[in-house]
Amino acid sequence: QPVKLTITSPVKVEDVFIKPTLEGATFDLTVKNHSGKKNQFDLYTDIVDKETGSVLYSSLSLQKLVLNADEEKMFTYSVNGLKPRLWTPHHPNLYDFRFRLVTAKGAELDCLSETSGFRTFEVKEGLFFLNGNRYWLRGGNHIPFALAPNDLNLANTFMQLMKVGNIDVTRTHTTPWNKLWMGAADKNGIGVSFEGTWPWLMIH
């Protein structure tokens, strides 16, 4: 498995969960203070179009956040009123979401960047809806993630072949996909039914 070493300040963004809508998103941002003293900081959010580099949003999101020594906390907030280019299998528009922790004096403590898109998928009246529009699933069975989970070239090549064959959706199998394959699916416009390790146990 790939390994990376990350050096950060004691106050660190541990994780973020992005819940997109058609005009914005809600964020669950987990921050931990690894130091032995209380820290105060502000949170800034930047949203940048991955293809064009244009800034969709950049602003101070939360002010004067405080974490005690060795404390971890989740901060939830929303950004609305945006007009993003939506993600679809035919137009897989993506954005870089940057979350910056900044002190009152302007020093950046940490910055986490995640790539995601603006999309919604729901079931209404027995039908599937992508971004509010009725959507007919065109899918295929699981693909060779388990054979080469760290092979980005295989992930991109296989998904591009899927697109040539008019297949826009697949499913995970045996084990959840890692970040590399999920990122390739986002980039290539492939929808994923994310199944658990034992999806068939509760059928009966």
Residue ranges of model-derived segments:
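Secreted/periplasmic carbohydrate-active enzymes, especially glycoside hydrolases
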Residues: Q1-V192
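Active-site-adjacent "subsite" loops/lids of carbohydrate-active enzymes
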Residues: R138, P199-H204
